[in-house]
Amino acid sequence: MKKFSELKVGDEYQSTCTFSKKEVEAYLAFSRIKNTIFDDDEYSSIVSGRAIISRMEGEFTRLSQIYGNMILLYGMDGDPKWENRNTRFLKPLHVDEILKIKYTISDKKDQDDEFGMITV
């Protein structure tokens, strides 16, 4: 675990994960967000973008550098400092494909010696 003072703007961390069919179904049941397109056999193996984002947030909290810190996740899309852009994916992710995730610390604000806020 890194202390807040050790995290630097520009630090990059990577993780990988996959989604099983069972995990996708569990997420959709929990979130109650399901696009009817996923009922079509042609699209049923595609992982929902919201499920991917949820997993990315979870994977971030499990990084050895982050694990053990108090994490409060808030906001994601439409940040004025990010020119109000929204999260987009380059291509669909299918069940059992490997998702490669790269996190980059793009901003850091100190609150005091121990606490602060990072933008990833």
Report each predicted region and the residues it spans:
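Hydrophobic beta-sheet segments that form the core/acyl-binding groove
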Residues: P80-V120
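Hot-dog-fold acyl-thioester-processing enzymes
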Residues: M1-N84
